[in-house]
């Protein structure tokens, strides 16, 4: 709403080095409110079904008109809304419809700030098959922003070679911000959101978890992969590659320093050894046993090929001398279960093959673990004390994380036990 626009302007004017801003679409103003992006998707769905979408579109238009009126803006918002409405009515694709939330918000913010507006479709490029074209995008973005003029670039979307609009996945404005940061060789990428950085654990499971002041990109990748969701995980790659630190900040608490993400975070804040804990439920573990498996050439490839042929990617691959376990998403695996198992049996002739469903995978992540003896012992002792049965263990050679598998029923208590062992 207009109040958030004013907060954004205050933040931008606090530091003249803030020259580029990437807005997302308006979110919820209150608990039962609709996000503008959801309303735009609804318009597309209603139009595709032959239903009248105008009432939904009127809700969207009213949101933007209210903001423009309260801020006294001069941009021709009516013409922009009419263009969007006409294209939805003409059958524009879902990506075009969804992207207009950021586009319209960008027009308003540029007018409010007195900054230049640049349509992201001019520089954020995808290949014909829908893959993000990072290098072409970086070249175009760097060229267009080379004059140093303060610019608003709407997030979330870009375009195919033919100009058709293509979006990133939800939360993709984070990615656009990282793209712009890389293109202008920024000293820091500030990602302003509604939380003051990352927490060491999910506050829905651990009451009032400690804040994370600094974290490395590698640590964040581990935590994001396992479910931590403050920043879109794909937003890390452009700035990580360029060595640009990211600062997660809170729009509603701008004085809070937030969390700094960098290539090499300082080691003076390693207490309490771990950086964070994250996990996900709903995995299936396929355990394949065969005597002398380790001496059979191509055994692992044959097993994984059965999953690949059925478009099921594996999450983890713990192994023993005569045992190979494949951890996959239970939801993705379930409809293809029989055909995959039959394929594995046909190709490898195992002694036994067993499937364990309803498994949770929990990652304990921290650059400090490599410097501290007995980290794994503390972790497993805490789980044992809490009466939790460890179903799977996986630790990489980098010692950046320890991954454990437990029954879904033990998910919350496992995170609580690990947190209490290292933090409390």
Report the location of each language-model feature:
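Nucleotide/pyrophosphate-binding catalytic subdomain
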Residues: 1-232, 236, 329, 405-407
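Non-catalytic alpha-helical coupling and interface elements of nucleotide-dependent molecular machines
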Residues: 45, 69, 244-247, 345, ...
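A structural preference for short, hydrophobic beta-strand core positions in alpha/beta folds
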Residues: 117-119, 248, 316, 392
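Active-site C-terminal subdomain of aminotransferase-like
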Residues: 244-257, 281
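A conserved regulatory-domain signal marking ACT and ACT-like small-molecule sensing domains
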Residues: 257-424
């Amino acid at each position: 709403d207009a109040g958030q626009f004013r907060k954004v302007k205050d933040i931008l004017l606090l530091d003249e080095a803030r020259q580029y801003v990437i807005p997302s679409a308006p979110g919820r103003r209150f608990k039962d409110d609709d996000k503008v992006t959801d309303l735009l998707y609804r318009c597309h769905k209603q139009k595709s079904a032959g239903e009248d979408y105008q009432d939904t579109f009127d809700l969207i238009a009213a949101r933007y008109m209210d903001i423009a009126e309260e801020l006294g803006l001069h941009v021709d918002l009516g013409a922009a809304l009419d263009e969007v409405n006409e294209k939805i009515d003409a059958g524009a694709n879902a990506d075009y419809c969804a992207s207009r939330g950021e586009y319209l918000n960008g027009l308003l913010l540029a007018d409010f700030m007195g900054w230049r507006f640049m349509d992201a479709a001019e520089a954020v490029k995808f290949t014909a098959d829908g893959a993000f074209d990072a290098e072409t995008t970086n070249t175009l973005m760097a060229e267009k922003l080379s004059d140093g003029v303060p610019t608003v670039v709407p997030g979330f979307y870009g375009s195919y070679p033919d100009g058709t609009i293509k979006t990133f996945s939800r939360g993709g404005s984070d990615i656009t911000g990282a793209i712009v940061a890389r293109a202008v060789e920024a000293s820091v990428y500030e990602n302003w959101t509604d939380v003051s950085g990352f927490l060491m654990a999910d506050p829905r499971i651990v009451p009032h978890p400690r804040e994370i002041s600094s974290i490395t990109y590698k640590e964040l990748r581990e935590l994001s992969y396992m479910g931590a969701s403050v920043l879109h995980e794909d937003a890390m790659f452009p700035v990580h590659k360029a060595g640009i630190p990211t600062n997660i900040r809170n729009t509603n608490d701008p004085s809070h320093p937030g969390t700094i993400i960098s290539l090499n975070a300082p080691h003076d804040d390693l207490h309490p050894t771990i950086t964070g804990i994250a996990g996900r439920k709903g995995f299936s573990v396929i355990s394949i046993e065969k005597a002398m498996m380790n001496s059979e050439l191509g055994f692992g490839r044959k097993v994984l090929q059965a999953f690949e042929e059925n478009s099921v990617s594996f999450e983890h691959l713990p192994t023993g001398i005569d045992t190979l376990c494949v951890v996959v998403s239970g939801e993705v695996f379930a409809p293809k279960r029989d055909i995959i198992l039959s394929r594995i049996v046909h190709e490898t002739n195992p002694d036994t093959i067993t499937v364990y469903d309803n498994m949770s995978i929990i990652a304990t992540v921290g650059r400090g673990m490599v410097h501290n003896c007995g980290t794994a012992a503390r972790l497993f002792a805490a789980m044992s004390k809490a009466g939790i049965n460890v179903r799977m263990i996986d630790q990489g050679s980098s010692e950046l994380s320890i991954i454990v598998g437990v029954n879904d029923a033990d998910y919350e208590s496992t995170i609580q036990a690990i947190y209490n062992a290292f933090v409390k």
